């Protein structure tokens, strides 16, 4: 796993635009190989240059893995929304926010998640095909490298 982590950190130099695609996995592997601090540094540098909800999410994940209470770590979503307005970040922040009316939380959260779902997809620049995951080759038109490595919300 150490080799996998090293390869993922090389994306910062060779393909920084692709780092959001693997940010969460980088944190997971970093935690297993004891490199959480290094992963956080790489992600923070990338985020500073190219703010992304996926990197913000991975930074929150890294903070929690490093022992920060989720209540404090999720402030990363608020900081992201201050830089880049994001319904995806708002949804993730809201999912852990206590409501005065317990019964309302599930209904509101489900509504927000449904509204956010289309924004969290990736879209082929050639044909407009949308997918929940990133593809090197579009399943719709078969074009290669036609998916920008950013979610629809961030385009």
Question: What name fits each language-model region?
Answer:
Residues 21-25, 58-59, 87-94:
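"A position-specific structural signal for the A-helix of alpha-solenoid helical repeats
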Residues 1-12, 35-49, 68-83, 102-115:
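Alpha-helical repeat scaffolds
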Residues 29-30, 59-65, 93-99:
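Residue at a conserved register position within TPR or TPR-like alpha-solenoid repeats
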Residues 76-155:
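Cys/His-clustered metal-coordination modules, chiefly Zn-binding fingers
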Residues 16-17, 51, 85:
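Helix-capping and short linker residues that terminate individual alpha-solenoid repeat units
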Residues 21-22, 38, 119:
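Alpha-helix N-cap/N′ positions at the starts of helices
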Residues 40, 53-56:
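Extended, charged alpha-helical interaction scaffolds
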Residues 15-16, 25, 36:
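Long amphipathic alpha-helical segments with strong coiled-coil/leucine-zipper propensity
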């Amino acid at each position: 796993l150490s080799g996998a982590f090293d390869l993922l950190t090389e994306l910062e130099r060779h393909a920084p635009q692709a780092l959001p695609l693997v940010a969460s996995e980088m944190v997971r592997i970093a935690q297993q190989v004891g490199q959480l601090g290094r992963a956080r540094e790489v992600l923070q540098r990338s985020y500073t240059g190219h703010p992304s909800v996926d990197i913000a999410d991975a930074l929150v994940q890294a903070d929690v893995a490093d022992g920060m209470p989720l209540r404090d770590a999720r402030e990363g979503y608020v900081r992201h929304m201050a830089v880049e307005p994001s319904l995806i970040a708002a949804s993730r922040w809201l999912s852990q926010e206590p409501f005065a009316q317990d019964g309302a939380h599930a209904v509101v959260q489900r509504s927000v998640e449904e509204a956010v779902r289309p924004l969290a997809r990736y879209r082929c620049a050639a044909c407009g095909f949308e997918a929940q995951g990133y593809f090197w080759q579009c399943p719709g038109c078969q074009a290669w490298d036609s998916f920008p490595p950013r979610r629809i919300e961030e385009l």
